[in-house]
A protein has these predicted regions:
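Flexible, polar/low-complexity N-terminal or interdomain linker segments that lie immediately upstream
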Residues: 1-33, 37-44, 117-139
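Short hydrophobic/charged patches on amphipathic alpha-helices used for structural packing
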Residues: 22, 62-63
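Conserved beta-strand positions in the Rossmann-like core of class I SAM-dependent methyltransferases
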Residues: 32, 51, 99
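Short loop/helix-cap segments at secondary-structure boundaries that form the rim of catalytic
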Residues: 42-48, 108
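Glycine-rich, highly charged phosphate/nucleotide-binding loops
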Residues: 53-61
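Short Asp/Glu-rich motifs
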Residues: 61, 110-111, 127-128
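Catalytic cysteine-centered active loop of the rhodanese-like fold, especially the PTP/DSP P-loop
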Residues: 63-109
């Protein structure tokens, strides 16, 4: 086994991306998506159906609120935010199977995946810079 094979295989065991998380949700795979950002970020918008648990609260809340047999996917703001990694560490310490969603909320939104806030669903946006935007052809 090469160093590269070992490295990338290990990396993929611990991370996922917005497209794969959305596909897992649509397929009904049993995952819990956890937003580890703060209250203001959560109020602004989040992944539809996500649970809010800021990373600093995971140690005290997870056991009471989450089934430890269900895999967890954590996310924060963007590729430049490390709160997702901090949250993943906290879940791992507690024995949860956890993966970090790379790209965070930013890439979820840019890929046009469903989001919501306390008012309800938010408009879906599609950014052609990060994904293929397919237009429906009439006929």
């Amino acid at each position: 086994m090469t160093d590269a094979l070992e490295y990338f295989s290990a990396k993929l065991r611990h991370e996922t991306d917005a497209s794969d998380v959305y596909a897992a949700q649509k397929a009904g795979e049993g995952i819990i998506v956890v937003d580890v950002r703060g209250d203001e970020a959560w109020a602004q918008g989040r992944i539809t159906g996500a649970l809010h648990m800021p990373y600093r609260e995971i140690a005290e809340r997870a056991a009471a609120e989450l089934d430890p047999t269900v895999p967890v996917v954590v996310y924060c703001w963007s590729p430049g935010c490390n709160a997702g990694a901090k949250g993943a560490v906290e879940f791992a310490k507690l024995g949860y199977s956890v993966r970090e969603m790379i790209g965070g909320y930013e890439y979820w939104v840019r890929e046009g995946q469903p989001t919501e806030n306390d008012e309800g669903p938010l408009p879906r946006l599609f950014d052609a810079q990060v994904m293929v935007v397919r237009q429906t052809v009439a006929g």
